[in-house]
Amino acid sequence: MVSASRPEALAAPVTTVATLVPHNATEPASPGEGKEDAFSKLKQKFMNELHKIPLPPWALIAIAIVAVLLVVTCCFCVCKKCLFKKKNKKKGKEKGGKNAINMKDVKDLGKTMKDQALKDDDAETGLTDGEEKEEPKEEEKLGKLQYSLDYDFQNNQLLVGIIQAAELPALDMGGTSDPYVKVFLLPDKKKKFETKVHRKTLNPVFNEQFTFKVPYSELGGKTLVMAVYDFDRFSKHDIIGEFKVPMNTVDFGHVTEEWRDLQSAEKEEQEKLGDICFSLRYVPTAGKLTVVILEAKNLKKMDVGGLSDPYVKIHLMQNGKRLKKKKTTIKKNTLNPYYNESFSFEVPFEQIQKVQVVVTVLDYDKIGKNDAIGKVFVGYNSTGAELRHWSDMLANPRRPIAQWHTLQVEEEVDAMLAVKK
């Protein structure tokens, strides 16, 4: 009995052990439990490291928040930039397509509109294709001039008053003009008067009077010309406009005063003599007047070969008397001579406003008399551009003032000098 029950008692524990061991050793853990263990370990490790950092907890939390914000901001910027690029590409494609269509059709559209406009014009005017269309020309407004006329029967003198001008056109770059007026009688034109130049104005007030010695019996056959010019120091003066008054249409029983509109000037048939450029300089303390003959251009052809041999004479005059005379060298075979020659005259300050400088351009001739090409004078009783040059010299002592002058017929200048003795 004892032997039989003992094996059974021994076997039971074996079976029990066999069933318990596998249950304790091989039962698998659930996925949630594994992740929780890993997170717990990581958290525990992080907290251990965090406690090692020598900062208070609130500082660590602030750093963490800033880091998170930076990461979020960077992500937002990257996403926005990507979206913006996509939109631009899309718009560019749409815009390119539209432009291509417009560029393709623009010529046809322009032709169509042009043809339509021509048809509309023809319909309005009633003209056919074979008829020529003439556009009406608007009259150019040149301004107007106020003047007065009177005759002194006792002294046989025609008195011409240049009062003022208005609404003149702007011929200079700055939107203004430098106007002055020329007055002369036709047909002789020997005696010309000029008003003073008024700078930078379109409405100059002159109030100047000029006297022509003309017998009344001859006055009816003459025509008075009043021409308004724009002064230019370094080039030819531009004519703004003019008008003519036949003397046989004027009633000299009373003083005539009226406004007249300026008309386009007729082309002058007078032969051009050329232009000369010279500078003036006056030193009051030394009483020294310096004239520098610089150059001349477009001189009249005097020789058979179509050229000239020009030189220049300078006379210092007072009361019709020649005080001193100078002359330049001769330039052979040219109509545009260059001199750059200086001449000095002693003129005391109290005499400077009483003298005249007469400049004459002549053509040298080995055989015979040297012919005068043209002449001009500045100084006492000069007018227009010549008076302006002299005034500028006096207003700027010690400074050379250069200016171009148009040469005039010698006889006309001599007549003016003779009258103004």
Curated annotation (Swiss-Prot):
Residues 135-381 are annotated as: Phospholipid binding. Residues 121-133 have a biased composition (Acidic residues). Changing K236Q: No effect on calcium-dependent neurotransmitter release. The modification Phosphothreonine is found at T128. A lipid is attached at C74, C75, C77, C79, C82 (S-palmitoyl cysteine). Its main location: membrane. Its cofactor is Ca(2+). Pfam families: C2. It comes from the Eukaryota. Keywords: Calcium, Cytoplasm, Cytoplasmic vesicle, Differentiation, Glycoprotein, Lipoprotein, Membrane, Metal-binding, Palmitate, Phosphoprotein, Repeat, Synapse, Transmembrane, Transmembrane helix. Ca(2+) 1 binds at D172, D178, D230, F231, D232. The modification Phosphoserine is found at S264, S342, S344. Expressed in the brain and adrenal medulla (at protein level). Residues 80-421 are cytoplasmic. GO terms for biological process: calcium ion-regulated exocytosis of neurotransmitter; calcium-dependent activation of synaptic vesicle fusion; cell differentiation; cellular response to calcium ion; detection of calcium ion; fast, calcium ion-dependent exocytosis of neurotransmitter; membraneless organelle assembly; neurotransmitter secretion. Ca(2+) 5 binds at D303, D363, D365, D371. One of its GO terms (cellular component) is glutamatergic synapse. The chain crosses the membrane at residues 58-79. GO terms for molecular function: calcium ion binding; calcium ion sensor activity; calcium-dependent phospholipid binding; calcium-dependent protein binding; calmodulin binding; clathrin binding; identical protein binding; low-density lipoprotein particle receptor binding. This is Synaptotagmin-1. The gene is Syt1.
